[in-house]
Amino acid sequence: MISRDGPLSFTEIMEKLEMNPKTDAGKFGYHLRMLTEAELLSADEASGKYYLTVFGQEVSNFIYGVEDAVRRKKGEMLVRTSSLTIEPFERKKIVEALIREANVPRKLAESISKEAEDRLKRPQVRYLTAALIREFVNAILLEKGLEEYRHSLTRLGQPVYDVTTTIKSAGYKDYPSPERVHALAGDAVFEEYMYLKVLPRTIADAHLSGAIHINNANYWVLRPADIQHDIRPFLCGKMPADGTGIALPSHPAPKSLKGALYTIDALLTSSSALCSNAQSISFFNVFLAPYIKDMKEADIKNILRDFLYSLNEKFNGISNSTIAFNVELEVPEFLEKVKAPSPEGEKGVYGDYSDQTLRLLGALLDLMNEGDGASKPLLNPVIFLKMRKKAYATNAANECLMKAYELAERWGNVFFVNQSLPWQTENVSYSSNLARVDSSWKDWESGTLRVGSLDNIAINLPRIAYGSKGDDDKFDEQLKEMLELAREALVIKRHVMNDRVQSDNLLPLFREEIDDSGYFRLSDSPGLISYVGLPEAVKYHTGLEISDNEDALRFAVKAVRQIDEYSSRSQPSIRLLSSSITFEPAAQRLTNLDIAAGYLKAKSAECYTEHSNLPLTVAIPLKSRLKNEEIFQQITRGGHLFDIRLGEPFPTINLLANYTKRIFETTGIGLLTFTRDYTFCVHCSTVSYGLHTKCPKCAYDGNRLVFYTKTFGRYKSSKAWSQSERDFAFNSKRSAL
């Protein structure tokens, strides 16, 4: 026992031997003294614990050897269990596992266990492991054609070699850390669990074969993709930041801007583990406007600066979600008469704070323009600036708008939302993963607040084109099959999320009631159906390019509209939305699988297009891109982006302003952003515009040059790029206004 468990005290030894201290202490003390006098044991004077001497360890090893030889002669086996103990083999445990884990009938379980025992005795293995026994049982199940039982009995996890590879390669992925290694290993387990236990074989096989791509597979069974927060219950003090007040302190309603921002910081921090990709705060400057009344500009900025630094220290988008603020250039009409939480309680309505709304927005944009102490950009939050019909109505609004264009010109970390379009509805909210929700679902609150994307299924459109061989009816039929798989997967996702919230209590904030419903409106949260490879599918199917042929464009629109109409027909049983955005790079995986399946030749194959309806690696006039994007944005209500990637020299602030105004007044574009590339040299702490392999200032050309650009709609440091993102950054074409 001491050989196995380490040094133990007199009392601990008696407890492990299940001896009674009152009746057995004398007898036990006598035997312990004999072992000590024989120099098999010795006592540590400081701790009072007994340990094996060198001689005692040798005797212990000899006894183990004799016992092992006797067991082998008798045909007995020892098992290293998954609970990290060594126990004699018991066949009944195989029977119990088969019944418990796979619902195998007892008679069949008895038969399989006997066969497994016979096979395990043959190799004369000194120590069996639970994993090895499971492999033998699974092999027997396969031989008997009992594959469904084998599925349920499969042990999840990585082989030893794969774990070693994960450890060795993690230093070259994202931001390396031991926690990142741990997360990568856990990701593999939960992804396998999703394939084997949660999704039907048809859906799992469709993903693994490359017909579809399940985004966030590692978190599919644990949490939704994103959330649109409503900060008002927290500002009122109705709910603690974690929902329960158990994990975090329960604070009273904040009485100052500093307190309000602390509350938001705590909310975002506690919620970062509850969603996979993104968190968004709508009406950020409107809801916080009451807290800056009578404050000086300098005081507002000092408090806000600390808040922004805190966000950027905590949220990098690798180990946790990224943050977006949806901000307004005016108090929307539907909020003007809504009661406003303030330092004095619910005093007044939001319409009373129109001046403060713009003052806070101006301060936020000033600080985002500043960057950090090393003149690098602040990547959090992503700003979505909503431009309603009265966006240019006041001088103060115009000043804020010009600050936003200055941010676009300097860092590019701002997205412009055309809220004046009828199809954008009364209110629209975007997340930093570019998911979109609007008020066409019920109303502006139920549709856009306390909701989030369940997740995203991307359809491999080129695979459908290869199978239909130019036949429109076959294309439509195969697309419908994939849409039905996507819908089924998202329905399952909603059921799983309901279990996590209601039964498993893994998402405590989401289940806490506010206004007679859970904080997270699960039934109002959409599942997204997106697509990859639209231009490639159209080219293969029609032989024509979307960018320069009306027939090709019509076919592309028809395909995307089919996704949108199918999603609409699924309502109201489940809220589904079509999207042109994936939450993670998927195109390279799908391209590689199509190469492996023989649809493409490896040498000539180019990566499919994603996050765009025209290939970004091909030089296409900006006007053509604009014309196409305008059409597709209106039928992809779950997410889209017109990413205007510009080269150097970059346009002036005034040119950006005039261009955006013209687009928003004359086209149907709902969301656009300007992307500017820049390089940060850690060696000399200098930012240079463009992607440079040698620092223009100090000529440094080593690995401390860090590139920044939007990859798939989001600014990321090159230290966090995947290979797909690196290829995207360097191969996508830049335009000029």
Regions found by a protein language model. Name each.
Residues 36-46, 572-576:
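A short, conserved structural fragment
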Residues 46-68:
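Short, cationic-aromatic polyanion-contact patches
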Residues 68-175, 727-734:
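Charged, amphipathic alpha-helical regulatory modules used
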Residues 2-6:
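Short helix-capping/hinge SLiMs at alpha-helix to coil transitions
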Residues 170-523, 544, 549-707:
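Conserved catalytic cores of very large enzyme subunits
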Residues 701-737:
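Long, charge-rich boundary regions
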Residues 20-37:
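Short amphipathic alpha-helical interaction segments
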Residues 7-17:
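Short acidic, hydrophobic short linear motifs in intrinsically disordered regions
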